[in-house]
Curated annotation (Swiss-Prot):
Its EC number is 3.2.1.52. It is an enzyme of class 3 (hydrolase). Optimum pH is 7.5. It comes from Pseudoalteromonas piscicida. One of its GO terms (molecular function) is beta-N-acetylhexosaminidase activity. This is Beta-hexosaminidase A. It comes from the Bacteria. The active site is at D305. Pfam families: Glyco_hydro_3 (PF00933). Belongs to the glycosyl hydrolase 3 family. The gene is cht60. GO terms for biological process: carbohydrate metabolic process; peptidoglycan turnover.
C-alpha cells in the first residue's frame, strides 16, 4: 500500500467531544461561494477556487471531517494543490487536528471533474467492460492506477469510485455506461481490480451505490427509485459485487444509494411532510447495518450519496435527513446542507445546534456516534502525510504514458456489432456525409478521419442540434457513404455536477428529445437513396436496436468525450479510435458488455 500512516494517528486516539464527532461525520461541498452576496443561495454561481477565511474558520471550529470537490473547484494544477493544502491547513487548526477526507467523483469517462486537457479522464467503465473478454482486468487495473496517481499528486485522497452497479436495465438514466457490464461476475472482477489499484496509488476508493443502482429507470437526483427484486435476485445480481469485493479487498469506503428496496427493508419512515414512506437504503438500519456490516462483514467507513439529491431532499429537511442517516449506521453525511454565502454559514450553525439537541434528546444514538467516529479515525490514519507537490503533479497529470493508455483503451473497446461489407471504408467511398449530435462531435470525427485517411476525403456534416432537412437530404444524395452517430440516454446531473445543474439539463433535454426521431428519418432517407450507412453508438449501446436495422454496419464506442485544447483543436480518444477502425488501420476488438437486440 502507498498510504503513509500519518502523524495524525495520535490525534485520532484523543477522545473527541460529541460536537467534534458530529463535525467529523460531515462532508461538505463548497462548489460555489458568494460571500456577502444577498442573492438567494441557489442562485450563487461563483466558483470557489481559493478557500475564504470564513470557510477555513468553519472547518476548524466545527472539526469538519471532509470536503468534496467539483469541476468548479479544480481549474488548474497549481490552483488545485493550493486549495487542497489550504483545506488540510484548516483541518490542522481544529481541536482534533484530524486530516480532511478530500473527495472527488473521478470515475473516468462521463463522470470526471478535472479538466480533460489536464488530467487523463479515459473512456469510462463500460469501455473497460468491452475489453474484458480479451483483456480480463488489465485495463481496469491500469486505468484506476493512473487516475489514483493523478488524484494523489493533487492532494485528493478519496475517489468516489468504482461504480459497481450492475446495469441490467436498458432504460437506466443515471448509471448506463458508468457500469462495467450487465454481468455481476464481470462487474465484480473489474470493480475489485479498481479498488486494489486506487488504494495502491494512495487514494481511498468508495464502492457505489449500495445496495445497487443498476436496475432503475429513475435517477435519484430527480426522484426516488424503487427496486422490487426478490431477495434471491438481489443476492445474485445487485449485492454480488459488493459482497465479493468486501471479502477479497475491502474498500476504504462504501457509498449508499437513495433507493427503496422493499425486499431488504419494507419498514416505514415519516418524512418531513408527515407522510409515511418506505425507507430509502440510505436511511435503513436494516440495509446499512444489519445487511452491510453484520451479514456482509464490512467494517470500513460508509458515506451517503449526496443528501441534496431529490431522492432525499424532496422528502426530508437537512436535519431530519442527517438524523435518519446516522441512526441507520451510516458514518458520513455527504452534502447535507449547502453553504454558498455568509447567511448559509449562520444556517449551518443552526443545523449543528439542532444535531447537538438531537443527541441530548436521544433522537441520535450516542453509541452509534462513537462507533462511527472510531471507524473514521481509523481510516484517517491511512491518509498520506505529506502535502501535495506541484512538481510531482505536473509530471503526473496527463503524462505521456497515461495518454497512451487512454488511447489504447479507447481503441480496445471499439465493438463491431454488424458489418455487411461496408468496413473498412472503401477507396471508392471518397464523399462521406456525417450525421452527429452536435457541431463539436462533427468536428471531432471529421478531424480524426482527415488525420488518419491515406486518401483525400470530402467530408460534410449535419448537426442534429440545428439543421435544415432539405440541405441534409442534398448532402446525403451526394455522398458515397453515410456515417451517423448518436448518444443515448442524455446526460444526467451527476455527469456535469449535481443538483445545481438539474434545471440546465431539463432545458438541454428538451432539445435532445427530438434527435432520435430526426436521426431515424435521415437514415430512412439514406436507405431509400441506396446509400451505404454506418451507425455509431457513442454511449449506451441499447439504441442499436433502433438504428442498427437502418444501417449496413454498426460500431459502439461507449464514449463521446470531446476535448477542445488550447489551440482550439477538437479531439477525443474515442473519435481517434473510431477513425482508425473505420479506415481499416485497426480492428474492432471489443465485445458488447450488455445485451442488445440487433
Amino acid at each position: 500500500m502507498s498510504f503513509i500512516t500519518s502523524a495524525h494517528a495520535t490525534a485520532a486516539q484523543v477522545p473527541l467531544t460529541t460536537s467534534q464527532m458530529l463535525g467529523q461525520k460531515l462532508m461538505l461541498d463548497f462548489r460555489y461561494y458568494c460571500g456577502e452576496s444577498k442573492k438567494p443561495s441557489g442562485d450563487c454561481r461563483a466558483a470557489m477556487t481559493t478557500l475564504p477565511p470564513e470557510l477555513s474558520e468553519l472547518i476548524s471550529r466545527y472539526d469538519i471531517g471532509g470536503a468534496i470537490l467539483f469541476a468548479e473547484n479544480v481549474q488548474n494544477t497549481a490552483q488545485i494543490i493550493s486549495l487542497t493544502n489550504a483545506l488540510q491547513s484548516a483541518a490542522q487548526q481544529s481541536k482534533s487536528q484530524l486530516p480532511l477526507f478530500i473527495a472527488i467523483d473521478q470515475e473516468g469517462g462521463r463522470v470526471a471533474r478535472i479538466n480533460r486537457e489536464q488530467a487523463t479522464s479515459f473512456t469510462g467503465n463500460m469501455s473497460i467492460g468491452a475489453t474484458y473478454p480479451k483483456q480480463g482486468d488489465i485495463y481496469a487495473t491500469k486505468v484506476a492506477s493512473a487516475i489514483g496517481k493523478e488524484l494523489n499528486s493533487l492532494g485528493i485522497n478519496v475517489n468516489f469510485a468504482p461504480t459497481v452497479d450492475v446495469n441490467s436495465n436498458p432504460n437506466n438514466p443515471v448509471i448506463n455506461v458508468r457500469s462495467f457490464s450487465e454481468n455481476p461476475t464481470v462487474v465484480t472482477k473489474l470493480g475489485l481490480a479498481q479498488v486494489k489499484a486506487f488504494e495502491a496509488a494512495g487514494v481511498l476508493s468508495a464502492l457505489k451505490h449500495f445496495p445497487g443502482h443498476g436496475d432503475t429507470h429513475v435517477d435519484s437526483h430527480t426522484g426516488l427509485p424503487r427496486v422490487d427484486h426478490d431477495r434471491d435476485k438481489i443476492n445474485q445480481q445487485d449485492l454480488l459485487p459488493f459482497a465479493e469485493i468486501i471479502k477479497a479487498s475491502p474498500p476504504g469506503m462504501i457509498m449508499t444509494a437513495h433507493i427503496q428496496y422493499p425486499a431488504l427493508d419494507n419498514s416505514k419512515v415519516v418524512n418531513s411532510q408527515g407522510e409515511s414512506m418506505i425507507r430509502p437504503a440510505t436511511m435503513s438500519y436494516q440495509i446499512m447495518t444489519q445487511l452491510l456490516r453484520h451479514e456482509l462483514g464490512y467494517q470500513g467507513v460508509t458515506v451517503t450519496d449526496a443528501l441534496d439529491m431529490a431522492g432525499i431532499s424532496d422528502f426530508f429537511n437537512p436535519v431530519d435527513a442527517t438524523i435518519e442517516t446516522f441512526n441507520a449506521g451510516v458514518d458520513i453525511a455527504l452534502m447535507p446542507i449547502a453553504i454558498r454565502n455568509r447567511a448559509d454559514i449562520k444556517r449551518f450553525e443552526q443545523y449543528m445546534a439542532q444535531l447537538a439537541d438531537a443527541l441530548e434528546t436521544n433522537k441520535l444514538n450516542q453509541e452509534q456516534l462513537s462507533s462511527s467516529m472510531a471507524r473514521i479515525a481509523k481510516l484517517k490514519t491511512k491518509l498520506p502525510q505529506s502535502s501535495a507537490s506541484l512538481a510531482i503533479a505536473n509530471s503526473t497529470l496527463g503524462n505521456p504514458s497515461h495518454r497512451r493508455l487512454e488511447a489504447e483503451l479507447a481503441l480496445a473497446a471499439i465493438t463491431e456489432v454488424k458489418n455487411d461489407g461496408v468496413l473498412p471504408l472503401r477507396d471508392n467511398a471518397q464523399v462521406v456525409h456525417l450525421i452527429m449530435p452536435d457541431r463539436q462531435k462533427c468536428f471531432a470525427l471529421e478531424q480524426a478521419l482527415q488525420t488518419y485517411s491515406k486518401n483525400s476525403l470530402t467530408l460534410s456534416c449535419t448537426s442534429l442540434q440545428a439543421y435544415d432537412p432539405d440541405i441534409a437530404h442534398d448532402a446525403i444524395k451526394q455522398a458515397d457513404m453515410i456515417i451517423a452517430a448518436h448518444a443515448s440516454p442524455p446526460q444526467s446531473a451527476v455527469e456535469i455536477g449535481g443538483m445545481d445543474d438539474v434545471k440546465k439539463l431539463r432545458e438541454h433535454g428538451v432539445a435532445r428529445n427530438v434527435q432520435p426521431a430526426a436521426l431515424k428519418a435521415l437514415l430512412q432517407y439514406g436507405q431509400q437513396q441506396g446509400k451505404k450507412q454506418l451507425f455509431i453508438s457513442l454511449r449506451a449501446p441499447y439504441e442499436i436496436s433502433t438504428f442498427g436495422p437502418l444501417s449496413n454496419a454498426v460500431l459502439a464506442s461507449y464514449a463521446y468525450n470531446v476535448d477542445v485544447n488550447h489551440d482550439k483543436k477538437v479531439a477525443g480518444p474515442a473519435y481517434t479510435a473510431l477513425a482508425k477502425v473505420i479506415l481499416g488501420i485497426a480492428k474492432a476488438e471489443g465485445s458488447l458488455p450488455v445485451t442488445v437486440n440487433h
